Regions:
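Short, compositionally biased P/S/T/A/G/V-rich stretches that sit at domain boundaries
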Residues: 1-26
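Extended acidic/polar, glycine-enriched regions
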Residues: 51-109, 601-603
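Carbohydrate-binding/catalytic loop surfaces
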Residues: 136-153, 191-211, 252-282, 332-358, ...
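Aromatic-rich carbohydrate-recognition surfaces in CAZymes
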Residues: 151-259, 284-292, 352, 356, ...
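Catalytic cores of carbohydrate-active enzymes
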Residues: 248-257, 283-284, 290-406, 447-448, ...
Length: 614
């Protein structure tokens, strides 16, 4: 016996709703198919809401033969989104359907130099990820690629890989907790922690406390864990106070950090002296850029917590520190390697001519002005052409001559390791600095060189000889140096793709796409923190015939500030956002022209930039 089914209780009474896929990425085109009700409908309204039920797309759809389709760009917060269909005469929707919005960090330009860089880096760096159960608790970190501490984590190598691992790592805080727990009573931070919980400190170094500060600051900006950050601030206060009172690392005359005589930021003295920081002091440019940005970071963290007095004090301290450092170390072309505080005779070798790795930090950390940065970049280009070395990634250029007899170890000869060897992290910082300071063409050239290096060699060692051959010093050398690959990731994501998280968790994003310098006409870029759902995504298309650019964007945040690099010879004449004109400025960075404007982030938005050409 067949049952009689009331039409009112069947799909036909409610209509049909479907999409082309149950999941998608931000700025994907979603196609919605609507089947009208059995009674027949001429139109309906389609509304799309994000996971918080906030609508970001709504359109009336005309139905023909009781069917219709439309498209929209998926946008807004990650998670399950809602599509609602409402037919005429209804006060409540007739049908609804979810689709899932998710994404990972990716660059999709169609250029074989750029697109593989991020996945290659992620896959190789994950080989150096370590997860320990120490006596104090769980520790997650990333190894040094050449250390004798095979089962330990150097703070510096780990944190200097953060510009890359912040996009995929889920557990970013526990390792920093272990370092805070191991802080000495006087405020000093250890250099590293072993699997068994033991610690070590290289006494030559004066940078560990600023690295710790940067680690907490950058991790907090990713995770958004205000309570954790506030809990770490007292430890950072003690660490930075220690630096400013210990006579081994503070020069009261110049009011700047000092260190025992070393090769820039590295952890050994000339002559392998072991006086535990008691003499042979210098003020090195590498330390000054680090403490300048660490003081700024303290100001930003206190400001976020509403502690205005502390924030302003640290901000004033940072700027005064920068001024003292620049006045002492800038030589008119570059920053000096260091200034001697104790008399050291280098037997006629002139250190003032050395171009040191710390100069790249001076540019990316803001110690150098834009004009000073361009001077340094041009000096790198000049020396690279002059030397013919494989890459301009020098630790020192030139290194200390072997005739001085400072080191007997083969890996410390001139042109090796930190005495003139080529270090990928230096190249990455130089590349990002070039992209940020009006030398975009050179930055693209460097990034393409790096891509070719990875294709040819399959990885990144800690250092190379000037001819490009990998340099070895321990049995623990592996070709996945996070302190190196991380800096090139920043050059790709923040430099070329131009996405920088200004406010933490991508609430406020600075978006400076520089694809015009690479000749890329169409690109899609997504940046996402795996530890949460913070992300930003854009599509950029350049129409050279019409002299226009179209920028579609979305994200999880609130505000975006744009400065889009224009092709050579273009000048902006009009900028519209969702077909409404917006205020803009043409900003010159040396010979480069950017068009700058701002916008809130709400759903999928489209910017059209119209230009005139020479």
């Amino acid at each position: 016996m067949s049952l009689r089914k009331p039409l009112e209780a069947t799909p036909g009474a409610f209509g049909g709703l479907d999409t082309d896929s149950p999941s998608c990425r931000p700025l994907d085109t979603v196609t919605v198919h609507v089947q009208g009700r059995a009674r027949g409908d001429e139109r309906c309204t389609v509304r799309v809401c994000d996971p918080d039920q906030q609508p970001y797309f709504e359109q009336e759809l005309e139905l023909r033969d009781n069917q219709g389709s439309l498209q929209f760009l998926a946008a807004g917060p990650l998670g399950n989104h809602y599509i609602y269909v409402t037919f005429p005469g209804e006060s409540y929707h007739s049908r609804y359907l979810n689709f899932h919005l998710d994404c990972e960090t990716a660059v999709e330009s169609g250029d074989s130099d750029f697109d593989p860089l991020y996945p290659f880096t992620r896959d190789r760096m994950l080989l150096g990820r370590r997860e320990y159960e120490t006596p104090r608790g769980r520790f997650v970190g990333y190894i040094s690629a050449d250390t004798l501490h095979l089962d330990g984590i150097w703070l510096r190598d780990w944190i200097y890989g953060l510009p890359a691992y912040k996009y995929w790592e889920l557990d970013m805080q526990c390792g920093l907790d272990r370092f805070i727990e191991a802080q000495h009573e006087n405020g000093m931070i250890p250099d590293g922690i072993e699997r068994n919980g033991g610690t070590w400190r290289a006494w030559v170094e004066s940078d560990v406390e600023y690295i710790m500060t940067l680690g907490v600051w950058q991790t907090w900006k990713v995770t958004g864990d205000d309570a954790w950050m506030a809990g770490a601030l007292p430890a950072l206060e003690r660490a930075l106070a220690y630096v400013q009172r210990d006579e081994r690392v503070w020069d009261p005359g110049h009011q700047l950090v000092k260190r025992q005589h070393s090769c820039d930021t590295w952890d050994f003295d000339i002559d392998s002296a072991g006086d535990l920081g008691g003499g042979r002091h210098v003020i090195a440019n590498c330390d000054q850029s680090g403490y300048y940005v660490a003081f700024r970071a303290m100001g930003e963290m206190y400001a976020h917590l509403g502690r205005t007095d502390e924030a302003e004090a640290w901000t004033r301290k940072a700027e005064a520190y920068r001024q003292r450092a620049v006045e002492l170390l800038w030589d008119g072309t570059k920053f000096l390697h260091h200034v001697h505080l104790d008399e050291i005779d280098h037997d006629g070798f002139d250190e003032t001519g050395q171009l040191t790795m710390g100069n790249t930090w001076a540019m990316t950390r803001g110690l150098a002005s834009p004009e000073q940065a361009r001077s340094i970049i041009d000096e790198y280009r000049r020396r690279h052409a002059e030397t013919g070395d494989a890459y301009p990634w020098w630790s020192l250029q030139p290194g200390y001559p072997d005739e001085l007899g400072y080191w007997s170890a083969p890996f410390l000869k001139q042109g090796a390791y930190a005495n003139g060897g080529l270090m990928p992290w230096v190249g990455g910082e130089l590349c990002r600095a070039a992209l940020l300071n009006g030398r975009e063409d050179y930055g693209v050239e460097l990034l393409r060189q790096w891509a070719e290096h990875l294709r040819r060699t399959g990885g990144a060692h800690v250092w190379y000889w000037p001819d490009g051959e990998p340099g070895f010093r321990t049995t623990n050398e592996v070709p996945y140096a996070g302190w190196g690959m991380g800096e090139w990731t920043a050059a790709l994501v923040e430099g070329l793709a131009g996405i920088t998280d200004s406010g933490g968790q991508m609430r406020t994003v600075q978006v400076n796409p520089r694809w015009a310098a690479a000749g890329v006409a169409e690109v899609r870029t997504t940046v996402r923190y795996a530890a949460n759902r913070a992300y930003f995504a854009y599509r950029l298309r350049t129409d050279r015939r019409a002299a226009t650019l179209r920028l579609d964007f979305t994200g999880s945040g609130e505000q975006a500030r744009f400065a889009v690099l224009l092709p050579r010879g273009w000048q902006p004449t009009r900028v519209s956002l969702d077909e409404r004109p917006v205020e803009f400025k043409a900003v010159s960075v040396d010979a480069s022209v950017y068009v700058a404007f701002g916008s809130g982030i709400a759903g999928a938005q489209a910017v059209i930039i119209e230009c005139e050409t020479d």
